[in-house]
Swiss-Prot record:
E.C. number: 4.3.2.10, 3.5.1.2
Record's GO cellular component terms: cytoplasm
Domain spans labelled Glutamine amidotransferase type-1: 3-213
Entry annotated with the keyword DNA repair: no
Catalytic activities: 5-[(5-phospho-1-deoxy-D-ribulos-1-ylimino)methylamino]-1-(5-phospho-beta-D-ribosyl)imidazole-4-carboxamide + L-glutamine = D-erythro-1-(imidazol-4-yl)glycerol 3-phosphate + 5-amino-1-(5-phospho-beta-D-ribosyl)imidazole-4-carboxamide + L-glutamate + H(+); L-glutamine + H2O = L-glutamate + NH4(+)
List of catalytic residues: 81 (nucleophile), 195, 197
Protein name: Imidazole glycerol phosphate synthase subunit HisH 1
Gene behind this protein: hisH1
Subcellular location: Cytoplasm
Length: 213
């Protein structure tokens, strides 16, 4: 049986994430100590809300260094929504805030308009398609294995991750033509801007692939 540890730091939809992994009979642990993070087989960092609040939650519980050490260990790591954004170096959300710096880059606001110049709704909420990126790696040996191009997943966000190295962008989505990082990857580390636990069969397939790494 595969096991996965989900970081419990007071910010995130832990139960829905846990249920998605339990669908595949995974052993799910909600971890609330640095020691539990370090002993995990696979680690998931979920999160909803503001970047600053998320980082404060991790700092208060002394989770910053254990998460960094886990990420460097080579074991599978997945950030979801805010959890993905915190993987980057910094965020410009309501000021300048330092992130975990697992992947070099910055979190910036989603463009307020499409490529045609027309204003669109922020936050970006709803189903949108996954598309390949020009410089990212092939999906066949990643958590997107078996995911067809243009599969739809569920987004809820006002900010987006911009890795410094475009090769770290595994998949994008297009919001009125504006490219947004949907999945980022650096070796053992993955981040999903969308919510796989709310994305139907496509999301469940991604979770299943993460359990098989």
């Amino acid at each position: 049986m595969s096991s996965v540890s989900i970081v419990d730091y007071g910010v995130g939809n832990l139960l829905s994430v846990a249920r998605a992994f339990q669908y595949f009979d995974a052993s799910v642990n909600l971890v609330s100590t640095p020691e539990e993070i370090m002993s995990a087989d696979r680690l998931v960092l979920p999160g909803v809300g503001a970047f600053e609040d998320g980082m404060k939650g991790l700092t208060t519980l002394n989770f910053i260094e254990p998460i960094k050490q886990f990420a460097r260990s080579g074991k599978p790591f997945l950030g979801i929504c805010l959890g993905m954004q915190m993987m980057l170096s910094r965020s410009t959300e309501f000021g300048q805030h330092e992130g975990l710096d697992l992947i070099a880059g910055e979190v910036v606001s989603v463009p307020s308009h499409g490529v045609d110049g027309q204003l669109h709704k922020i936050p970006h909420i709803g189903w949108n398609e996954l598309v390949s990126t020009s410089e990212g790696e092939d999906w066949c040996h990643t958590i997107l294995k078996n995911i067809p191009l243009n599969s739809s997943v569920y987004f809820v966000h006002s900010f987006m991750a911009m890795p410094s190295n475009p090769k770290k962008r595994l998949a994008d989505t297009l919001y009125d033509g504006q490219a947004i990082s949907a999945v980022i990857k650096d070796e053992n580390m993955y981040g999903c801007q969308f919510h796989p636990e709310k994305s139907g069969e496509v999301g469940l397939s991604i979770i299943q692939q993460f359990l098989q790494i």
